[in-house]
Swiss-Prot record:
It comes from Bacillus cereus (strain ATCC 14579 / DSM 31 / CCUG 7414 / JCM 2152 / NBRC 15305 / NCIMB 9373 / NCTC 2599 / NRRL B-3711). Its EC number is 3.1.11.6. The lineage of its organism: Bacteria, Bacillati, Bacillota, Bacilli, Bacillales. This is Exodeoxyribonuclease 7 large subunit. It is an enzyme of class 3 (hydrolase). PANTHER family: EXODEOXYRIBONUCLEASE 7 LARGE SUBUNIT (PTHR30008:SF0). One of its GO terms (molecular function) is nucleic acid binding. It comes from the Bacteria. It is found in: Cytoplasm.
Length: 452
């Protein structure tokens, strides 16, 4: 029988088909620890699930992982549901996850803690960004369910405490998947209106699932971006949501939020009354002081004899005018004298005078230089003539003109003695007008007496 060889692709597809048709492998509940976690830019998640003895590759596509509330991380233990299949390119089997939740910690609780840490690191909870709640808000916006107990408590409290205030309700969903987008849109709408002074965002109590819309990141960022101060009022006093941390002020209950947003009109009336009384008392004291001052003025000399005071002041004015005229004349004379002194100084130190003096000095120096140069030149000329005369007197040519000559040997050395030549040597005799080539035919030696 002839052997049939399978291709790698055919074998891999056969194994994949076997696995995918196994009902036990198409609905698998698995628990393990996440490692090698990667979140692809397209939203898909790739990681490894492992325990103490084994590991399996895992894939969770974006269509499934967008519904999980927490952020998977390396080292996190999870419970997953999925199916087993083969990735043909590598020939490896892996689990394709359809659902995932934390192992040992509630899914929502983990998501809450992760988001809280991340937003706090970004600074969304910082007191630096908290806006002050206006003490006397004219218009109060309320973002909550239009049918719950929270809206009744808020409106009742505001109307009781601050009946002159306006209340605008922005009805929203407060639980379910559509609740968070509904709350975000209401916050944006309130900001766009431009007439809301303060916003109350909240709902009544409930489970963590029912309150979850106020733990969504989009709601937290909408509260942070709001230009209107926001008071959060979610659940009961013990309930804390992400919205509470981001809001400008947290109220333990919706009723407490209304009390923080709306002042007590009775207390305001009492304050107005007290301030009115203080103002009246201050006015009475001021009027009394002015009356006393008026009485003092009425008894004064100026009030009883205004004509005399006027004449005295008129005389003082005349004297002051005379002193002013004299002071003006003295001032003008002083300035005229200063001007004359400055003019004299300027004329004395005018640049033209300095230039003229310098020009005269330069001309004097030039004449002196010319005289000294002329004297030096004459001295040098006289010295040159004397040196030339001495040189001429010592010149061999001058001696030759008197009949003398210079005798040289064959090596052109001057002969100073008959002992320096021998018979037959060639010599040359330099005379005034030429040179004689001679031969020594005889030598006659003489004794010198005193150099003669």
């Amino acid at each position: 029988m002839e052997k049939q060889y399978l291709t790698v692709t055919a074998l891999t597809r056969y194994i994949k088909t076997k696995i995918e048709y196994d009902p036990h492998l198409q609905s698998v509940w698995l628990k393990g620890e996440i490692s090698n976690f990667k979140n692809h830019s397209r939203g898909h998640m790739y990681f490894t699930l492992k325990d103490e003895n084994a590991r399996i590759a895992a894939v969770m596509f974006a269509g499934h992982n967008r519904n999980i509330k927490f952020k998977p991380e390396n080292g996190m233990k999870v419970l997953v549901k999925g199916k087993i299949s083969v990735y043909e390119a590598s020939g490896s089997y892996q689990i394709y996850i359809q659902d995932m939740q934390p192992d040992g910690v509630g899914n929502l609780h983990l998501a809450y803690e992760q988001l809280k840490v991340r937003l706090e690191e970004e600074g969304l909870f910082s007191q630096v960004y908290k806006k002050a709640i206006p003490p006397y808000a004219k218009t109060i916006g309320v973002i909550t369910s239009p049918t719950g107990a929270a809206i009744r408590d808020i409106i009742t409290t505001i109307k009781r405490r601050y009946p002159i205030g306006n209340v605008i309700v922005f009805p929203v969903l407060v639980q379910g998947e559509s609740a968070a987008p509904s709350i975000v849109q209401a916050i944006r709408t309130a900001n766009e209106m431009g007439e809301i002074d303060v916003l109350i965002v909240g709902r009544g109590g409930g489970s963590i699932e029912e309150l979850w819309a106020f733990n969504e990141e989009m709601v937290a960022r909408a509260i942070f971006k709001s230009e209107i101060p926001i008071i959060s009022a979610v659940g009961h006093e013990t309930d804390f949501t992400i919205a509470d941390f981001v809001a400008d002020l947290r109220a333990p209950t919706p009723t407490a939020a209304a009390e923080l947003a709306a002042p007590n009109i009775i207390e305001l009336q009492e304050k107005v009354l007290q301030r009115t009384l203080r103002l009246q008392r201050a006015m009475r004291e001021l009027v009394h002081k002015k009356e006393e001052k008026l009485q003092v003025l009425q008894k004064s000399y100026a009030f009883r004899y205004p004509r005399q005071v006027y004449e005295q002041k008129e005389e003082q004015l005349d004297r002051a005018l005379e002193q002013l005229v004299l002071a003006k004349e003295r001032y003008i004379d002083k300035k005229v004298n200063q001007l004359k002194q400055l003019s004299f100084y300027l004329e004395k130190h005018h640049p033209s005078q300095k230039i003229m003096q310098t020009k005269v000095a330069v001309e004097t120096l030039q004449k002196q230089l010319q005289r000294e140069m002329q004297t030096l030149l004459q001295t040098k000329e006289f010295a040159f003539v004397r040196a030339a005369q001495k040189l001429e007197a010592l010149s061999p040519l001058k001696v030759m003109m008197r009949g003398y000559g210079l005798v040289y040997d064959e090596e052109k050395q001057v002969l100073k003695s008959v002992k320096d030549v021998s018979l037959g040597d060639a010599v040359s005799v330099q005379l005034q007008d030429g040179i004689l080539d001679c031969s020594v035919s005889g030598i006659e030696e003489r004794e010198l007496n005193n150099g003669k």
